[in-house]
Design a protein with these regions (language model features):
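Ribonuclease/tRNase effector modules and their secretory precursors
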Residues: 1-386
C-alpha cells in the first residue's frame, strides 16, 4: 500500500486536465473558444489509448493526467526508508520505459484533434487559427503541471498583382498547423517543368480570391478549413500536369483522392493560382473525356450540377451502376472513391439530383454505347494529359 505522504505529494504535483486559453495578442471569438472547450473535452474523454495491451486502456484525458502524473513523478516513489515498495518501484520503472512509444502516439492523437478543431473555423481568405499544446508548471504548486492549449490567430491580408493588365487581389497561401503556426507554401519552378537559371529557387504561392471562391463553390460539401487544408497539402507535394493549351495544372486532392486541379501561372516572381477546376470541368483531362463520352458540354454539366462535389455525395448517383460505368470510363473514378470514403461526413449533398434524369438527358442506352463503357472496370491510373 502506498503511504499517505506519497499520495499527498502526488496530488500536489499532479498533472491537471486540459485548459484552453487565448494566446498573447491573438483575437479569437468567444464562439470558437467555447467550441474548442466543448469539443476537446468530449474527444479527450471518449478517445481511448492502449497503455498495456490486454490489460490497461485509458482515455486520452486519463493518459495526460493520471498516467503522466505517475510517469513524471516516479522519483517520489524512491525514498530510501521505504524498502517495502521496491518490487512496486521496479514494475513502475519498466512501465515508464514502455511509455515512450505510447507518449508519441498520444501526442499524435492530440495533434490530430487540434488540427480537426480548426477545420470548422479556418479560412485562408479571412483568418487562420491554430492550437498549441504545452505542459506548463501549475502556479502555486511544486512541480505541478497543466496541459495548456493556447489558441492563436492570424488575420489574412490580401495584396494585388497585375494579370492581363488588370490589378487582381491575391492571398499568400499557407496553413496554420497545430503546435507550429503558419506554414507558407513555396514551390520551385523546376517542379512545374520550368527550365531556366532560377528554376530551383522556391517561389511563394499566391491564390486569386476568384480561385478561392471557385474552390468553395465546387468543393461544397465539407468544412472550409478542411478544404483549405487539403489545398495546402496538395501544393506542398504538387503533382503537375499540362493541359492541351500548355497551361500548368496542379492536382487538388481531398485527403489523398483527386477532386480537381489548380491552374497556375508564374507572375511577378510569384506562383499564382488563377482558378480551380473541378474534375468534371471541361479544362481537365477527365472533363474532356467525360464530354467526349456523353456529349455533355459546360452548360450541360452546370444544368445537371455535375460541376460540384456535393452532387456526387448523393446515393442516387453514387449507387447507380450506369452512372458509375460512365464515370469509370471517363477516368472520374476518383469521384466514386470520394463518395465511398466521405459521403457519411459530407455537410451538403444534392437532394434533388436524379441519376435517371441525367441518363435520359445524355440519351444513355447500352445498345448504343461501346462495350468498354457498358462494363468499365474501376481504373486506377493517373489522368492522361491531352
Amino acid at each position: 500500500m502506498i503511504p499517505q505522504k506519497i499520495l499527498d505529494k502526488l496530488y500536489s504535483t499532479r498533472t491537471h486536465s486540459f485548459k484552453i486559453v487565448v494566446a498573447g495578442e491573438s483575437s479569437v471569438p468567444s464562439r470558437i473558444i467555447n467550441d474548442a472547450i466543448l469539443t476537446l473535452s468530449y474527444l479527450t474523454k471518449n478517445q481511448k489509448i492502449v497503455v498495456i495491451p490486454g490489460k490497461l486502456v485509458v482515455t486520452l484525458d486519463e493518459f495526460f493526467t493520471v498516467i503522466l502524473t505517475v510517469s513524471v513523478n516516479l522519483n517520489i516513489f524512491l525514498p530510501d526508508d521505504l524498502p517495502a515498495l521496491k518490487p512496486f518501484i521496479r514494475k513502475l520503472k519498466k512501465f515508464n520505459i514502455a511509455l515512450d512509444n505510447i507518449f508519441d502516439k498520444a501526442n499524435e492523437d492530440i495533434r490530430k484533434m487540434l488540427l480537426s478543431l480548426a477545420f470548422s473555423h479556418n479560412d485562408i481568405g479571412k483568418t487562420l487559427y491554430w492550437l498549441k499544446h504545452q505542459l506548463n508548471p501549475t502556479p502555486g504548486l511544486e512541480r505541478g503541471i497543466v496541459n495548456l492549449i493556447s489558441i492563436n490567430s492570424y488575420k489574412i491580408e490580401s495584396s494585388s498583382i497585375v494579370v492581363d493588365d488588370n490589378h487582381r487581389p491575391v492571398i499568400r497561401l499557407g496553413y496554420a498547423l497545430p503546435n507550429y503556426g503558419i506554414d507558407w507554401v513555396a514551390i520551385k519552378p523546376s517542379v512545374l517543368k520550368v527550365d531556366n537559371s532560377f528554376a530551383d529557387i522556391p517561389l511563394d504561392v499566391y491564390i486569386q480570391t476568384h480561385a478561392l471562391q471557385r474552390l468553395s463553390e465546387r468543393i461544397d460539401c465539407f468544412p472550409t478549413g478542411s478544404i483549405h487544408y487539403n489545398m495546402f497539402i496538395s501544393l506542398k507535394d504538387p503533382r503537375v500536369f499540362y493541359d492541351g493549351n500548355q497551361n500548368i495544372l496542379i492536382e487538388y486532392r481531398y485527403f489523398g483522392t483527386r477532386a480537381g486541379y489548380f491552374r497556375v501561372d508564374i507572375i511577378e516572381g510569384k506562383i499564382v493560382i488563377r482558378t480551380f477546376l473541378f474534375v468534371t470541368n471541361n479544362g481537365t483531362p477527365e472533363g474532356i473525356k467525360l464530354g467526349n463520352i456523353t456529349g455533355l458540354q459546360r452548360l450541360d454539366k452546370k444544368y445537371l450540377a455535375l460541376d460540384r462535389l456535393s452532387t456526387f455525395m448523393t446515393s442516387d448517383l453514387g449507387e447507380n451502376e450506369n452512372v458509375r460505368n460512365i464515370l469509370n470510363s471517363a477516368d472520374c473514378h476518383c469521384l466514386l472513391e470520394l463518395y465511398e470514403r466521405c459521403q457519411k461526413v459530407a455537410t451538403n449533398t444534392s437532394k434533388h439530383f436524379d441519376a435517371d434524369l441525367m441518363l435520359k438527358y445524355i440519351g444513355y442506352d447500352k445498345k448504343y454505347l461501346p462495350e468498354s463503357i457498358q462494363h468499365a472496370p474501376l481504373l486506377r491510373t493517373q489522368p492522361e494529359i491531352i
